[in-house]
């Protein structure tokens, strides 16, 4: 299903963010959030989805039934709600969303899109038994609809950087306070790699709430090897193979996942061998994803390798640029599409020392996309040679004309919705 029939997405800026609305809605629906399996609650700016995917892969491989709630989605809404390891069916999705619609109208509640879909997900999770629920925040943490869950089993805070400043604050400590809102008294929290001022904010919050924290660089860490990485903590040291998800940042995500499992492993008893295999089997599309040339042979020759990455903020751009610098040698073409709340020049500045040709495109599946002309003009301010194309498909065609049959790489980035546009071309 592309989108549920209810609630209807809105792009209003006056949405009230608090937990009162979701609490009223869940009461009207019978408080399904009180009957969920043990919850792993995840907040952060980057790495939430990758960490969720790794956890899902590991727990599934270990034989556990896994519920998972993530956002946004690539192609269809069902991706967001995984019930006992399977994407929710169209029929079940319609049923739980209809329950939300009926309750909303009966009790005069106007849920936001995320509040309504979160309530629908909880209804689906309540109906089917599972051993664990991986629950990802939508925005922030403290006032996020998922934070209605008062007693998770454990929490994870992935790397925090600048994003959604209009909602979360314009400094890293302010953003960190919002993300730290998922911390609960006496519930362990794994803290992934952060800059110092974020660490200090999270440590202070953990101390205030009496949260047992387990922190990257302080309580556990990694050392990269030729075949993977060595994870070490006060509890154990073990060499794990390279994860299926590419990039050094994914080693840090993997380390945080391993740390999390180690803290709850008395309850689940997952071996390091299963963790290793789970990391190797993780699938999470559009994260430095190498697309098989046969899938896009109608678009361009197989001498050109297409990569997809959903980097959309400065920290994501930095990670992607570092990976390109370390791994790609042939000519590089960057196809960029971004939403209107993104700073194009800042994003592109991370790629300015690379020999790169940029193409700005409008994101067709994003109503609030920057125009191709704006991306072209703003991208040029960073020092990159930018052009504009009428569409993603035309950008690939333009590259084909310039590049011919020579070896090259195309990086499609800037928006998850642009990645979605690409998959629809295949």
Give residue spans per PLM region:
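ATP-dependent carboxylate-amine ligase catalytic core
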Residues: 13-15, 19, 26-37, 61-150, ...
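Nucleotide phosphate-binding/pyrophosphate-handling subdomain across enzymes
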Residues: 36-38, 127, 132-137, 143-156, ...
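Extended acidic/charged loop-beta regions that coordinate divalent cations
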Residues: 72, 117-167, 199-239
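Beta-strand->loop->alpha-helix junctions that form or flank phosphate-binding loops
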Residues: 69-72, 192-193, 205-224, 244-248, ...
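C-terminal helical cap/extension that packs against the catalytic core
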Residues: 195-205, 210, 225, 302-308, ...
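Charged, amphipathic alpha-helical linker segments immediately N-terminal to NTP-binding catalytic cores
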Residues: 1-13
């Amino acid at each position: 299903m592309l989108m549920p029939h209810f609630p209807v997405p809105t792009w209003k800026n006056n949405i009230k963010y608090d937990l009162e609305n979701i609490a009223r809605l869940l009461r009207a629906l019978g408080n399904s959030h009180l009957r969920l399996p043990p919850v792993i609650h995840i907040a952060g700016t980057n790495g939430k989805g990758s960490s969720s995917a790794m956890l899902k892969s590991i727990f599934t491989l270990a034989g556990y039934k896994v519920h998972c709630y993530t956002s946004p989605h690539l192609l269809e809404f069902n991706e967001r709600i995984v019930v006992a390891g399977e994407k929710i069916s169209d029929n079940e999705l319609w049923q739980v969303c209809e329950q939300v619609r009926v309750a909303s109208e009966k009790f005069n509640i106007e849920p936001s899109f995320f509040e309504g879909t979160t309530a629908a997900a909880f209804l689906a999770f309540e109906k089917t038994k599972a051993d664990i629920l991986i629950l990802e925040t939508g925005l922030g943490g403290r006032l996020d609809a998922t934070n209605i869950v008062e007693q998770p089993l454990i929490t994870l805070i992935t790397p925090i950087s600048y994003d959604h400043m209009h909602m979360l604050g314009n400094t890293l400590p302010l953003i960190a306070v919002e993300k730290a809102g998922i911390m609960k008294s006496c519930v362990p929290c794994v803290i992934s790699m952060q800059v110092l001022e974020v660490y200090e904010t999270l440590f202070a919050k953990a101390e205030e709430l009496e949260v047992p924290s387990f922190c990257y660089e302080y309580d556990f860490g990694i050392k990269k090897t030729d075949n993977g990485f060595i994870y070490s903590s006060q509890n154990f040291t073990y060499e794990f193979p390279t994860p299926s998800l590419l990039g050094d940042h994914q080693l840090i995500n993997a380390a945080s996942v391993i740390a999390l499992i180690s803290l709850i492993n008395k309850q689940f008893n997952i071996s390091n061998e299963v963790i290793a295999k789970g990391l190797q089997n993780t699938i999470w599309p559009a994260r430095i994803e190498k697309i098989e040339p046969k899938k896009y042979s109608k678009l361009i020759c197989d001498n050109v390798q297409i990569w997809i990455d959903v980097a959309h903020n400065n920290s994501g751009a930095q990670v992607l640029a570092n990976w390109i610098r370390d791994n790609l040698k042939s000519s590089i073409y960057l196809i960029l599409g971004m939403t209107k709340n993104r700073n194009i020049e800042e994003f592109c500045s991370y790629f300015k020392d690379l020999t790169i040709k940029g193409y700005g495109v409008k994101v067709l599946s994003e109503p609030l996309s920057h125009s191709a002309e704006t991306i072209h003009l703003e991208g040029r301010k960073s020092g990159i040679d930018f052009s504009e194309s009428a569409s993603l498909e035309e950008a690939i065609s333009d590259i084909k004309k310039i590049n011919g049959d020579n070896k090259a790489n195309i990086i499609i980035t800037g928006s998850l919705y642009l990645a979605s546009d690409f998959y629809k071309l295949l």
